[in-house]
Amino acid sequence: MLAVEVSEAEGGIREWEEEEKEEEAAERTPTGEKSPNSPRTLLSLRGKARTGGPMEVKLELHPLQNRWALWFFKNDRSRAWQDNLHLVTKVDTVEDFWALYSHIQLASKLSSGCDYALFKDGIQPMWEDSRNKRGGRWLVSLAKQQRHIELDRLWLETLLCLIGESFEEHSREVCGAVVNIRTKGDKIAVWTREAENQAGVLHVGRVYKERLGLSPKTIIGYQAHADTATKSNSLAKNKFVV
């Protein structure tokens, strides 16, 4: 049944070119070893996850710090909201993540009204979850024309920020991320668990904005779930901005 429900989330993915060798040096630790969850390492392991290497060689798995669950939402107004939300699978290694990403449809190919959500195992992608209700989200709103230009890159970078624990000690504040495919314009949001943790929230926002490669002139805002739950998205006020 689930396979039928989420069939829209299946599909292919384009190839990614390798970075220049000099960029690799920036990802190494002071001891000269490459950080296991650095952006370049995560990308370089993608090919291995897809090919598996020679049959006689056992693939070395690279565990993630957290287990992550991918959810798929397809809007059907005849059903309750929670009945439209489906757990696709869970991943806890870099190789599992790339295998999953390579076999689901790109966000830009989803129909309007659909969402992907990647959350830490045990946290559901809804405001009502006890680990979300005191938190909020950093929201990136895209113009309609950006769907086929920037959406997939921004969403993948968001996923890599999550599984790579890119926010250092403040990564523990991160609950997950959601991409909403909408007719008026798509949205990507990173959810954190405590809206009142100003230092943690701002650190996540600054790092996230930098990782997305957004212009310094581009402003993204953080909204508390308590505010957005009682108001429309357009009326919700930003608690913080970066």
UniProtKB/Swiss-Prot annotation:
Residues 16-25 have a biased composition (Acidic residues). It comes from the Eukaryota. One of its GO terms (cellular component) is eukaryotic translation initiation factor 4F complex. Gene3D superfamilies: RNA Cap, Translation Initiation Factor Eif4e. GO terms for molecular function: RNA 7-methylguanosine cap binding; translation initiation factor activity. InterPro entries: TIF_eIF4e-like, TIF_eIF_4E, TIF_eIF_4E_CS. MRNA binds at W81, Q82, W127, E128, R182, T183, K184, G185, D186, K187, T230, K231, S232. Residues 62-65, 98-102, 157-164 are annotated as: EIF4EBP1/2/3 binding. Pfam families: IF4E (PF01652). SUPFAM superfamilies: eIF4e-like (SSF55418). Signal peptide: none annotated. GO terms for biological process: regulation of translation; translational initiation. The keyword Disulfide bond does not apply. Residues 32-41 have a biased composition (Polar residues). The keyword Ion transport does not apply. Keywords: Initiation factor, Protein biosynthesis, RNA-binding, Translation regulation. Residues 1-42 are annotated as: Disordered. Recognizes and binds the 7-methylguanosine-containing mRNA cap during an early step in the initiation of protein synthesis and facilitates ribosome binding by inducing the unwinding of the mRNAs secondary structure. eIF4F is a multi-subunit complex, the composition of which varies with external and internal environmental conditions. It is composed of at least EIF4A, EIF4E and EIF4G. Belongs to the eukaryotic initiation factor 4E family. This is Eukaryotic translation initiation factor 4E type 1B.
